[in-house]
């Protein structure tokens, strides 16, 4: 019995030791597992932050982290939106100047092109109007300077009218990176843009100056020789303008809405500038005639000017409809956004502009007798000028100020400033030389022009 109890006690002791050893082994294993788990957690934290967050912040803590991240993103998005809104508000004074400058540039540039056409086509009927065209053409200088200065200030981020000028817009990884605009940096780069802008300025002003210079020299010299010189200048200029009329429209206007493009835009802008310049030519000519000057201008000249204004109002409308209809019918997202913004935010000026640029002037001078009545033609010219200012307004303002637009002292002041400069330059040029281009080889034809 004692031996049995001893054996039983020995077995119990052995069992207890085995249990302790087993427990220690399990404890060591658990400790090793915990250490391995911790080490794995540290590695996972270095490799994938989201996985570590799930391990280290389970349940409510993880939800709090997600909510915090979403709140941070919302704040960042709000800050970016607020900054964009602030830029649009700050752009308004610059945009008001820019719209007026572009509009008055068109009044001179359209007549510079028309003046060149008179020499290339050897036109005789318009010889008595050339001095007015020359004066109007030279009025491009002041608005052109303002356009270039405002554009170049965008490179220094003085304003934010041109989205493609934003810092880092073409740098991969930059917060402002835009892959679509980055693809266009070959054309829309500060250096290339500046080179093109200077070429426009030099080429256009050179043509205006040379046509004026040779015209004045003909008053005291050989009129035929000077006329032939001007034919050469005009031929070179019309080819130059055929290219730059489109590229300048892309640079100065279409690049404001950098993502959007239209292959008709150059023609569309040219048509608007051209018809506006005829409206200005009509008003200046009738003003001078009303003051007792230019007695050689008769109702036939007025009729022809009215026909040009009528014809290019229809041409402008054709281009407007072609551009709008093709974009609307295709319904491509990157194209329709241009018109969606104007429908949503600029609906009133958008549709009023169509009425002023097409319906009213066409109805006013549709008949032959109406084109010969000064009062009717003046009214139609007024519609055209107001309408095409609104056209430029609708082209430029949505991309620069968004829905922070209006017509107040800024816009009115810009119009009055450039109108004053335009009138001053034109009347000063007219006062410096005889209104009649007396040695022009076709001046007699112009004096007795009939149709």
Language-model regions, residue ranges each:
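Hydrophobic alpha-helical transmembrane segments of polytopic
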Residues: 104, 108, 136, 140-143, ...
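Aromatic-anchored segments of alpha-helical transmembrane domains
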Residues: 243-247, 382-393
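Extramembrane terminal tails and long inter-domain/linker segments of multi-pass membrane proteins
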Residues: 1-89, 159-186, 212-230, 293-300, ...
